[in-house]
Amino acid sequence: MKTITIPKITPSGELDKIFDTLPLHTIGCCNWPVEFPYTPKAGFKLFHDGKCLYIKFIVTEDDIKASVTEDQGRTWTDPCVEFFVSPEGNLDYYNFECTCTGKLLLAWHPADATTEAAGKEVLDSVKRTPSLGTEPFGLREGEHSWSVIEVIPATALFRSGVESFDGKKMTANFYKCGDELPTPHFLSWNPIEWKEPSFHRPEQFGELVFE
């Protein structure tokens, strides 16, 4: 199991200046190399200030598009970066799935296999800053680099009663996918052992340790 210790930093000024000082964690596990060998460059940096978790995803990949036009859409079909987290380190988890234009899918997945989608107030509380802007666009061929910053308040874990990230230990995984891109791919930070692409595997999350 991989582990990341997340530093506590009180942000002031531009977030990018803080992210520039932090290590890049690679989303590089190609878990299904026979069927889906393509491995774009993807990674993330992160810190927290107690009340919010700050994540910057950084991607370089071929052939991108932005078809999803609203939150809670089919985010995984566009260039998509994902953060799945279990606040209690068990089989209950949330999935934050964000496209290259900042469209977000967020839901709560308790261990009984039901799903509860986040409401508009919770979605709006997760601030997103995509480098490509927020408007949809058609297929852009060739290599492209993009990033998105997500600011996730503890209250976005809306069924867990988390008030602060201070001193917490959680389990999580980070992903890069694009199911309907010219070259579909399914990458993870922590390895996944499963017969087919599936990111909904909380038993195979890594560990996050919050300062």
Report each predicted region and the residues it spans.
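Structural preference for beta-rich elements and adjacent junctions enriched in aromatics
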Residues: 1-211
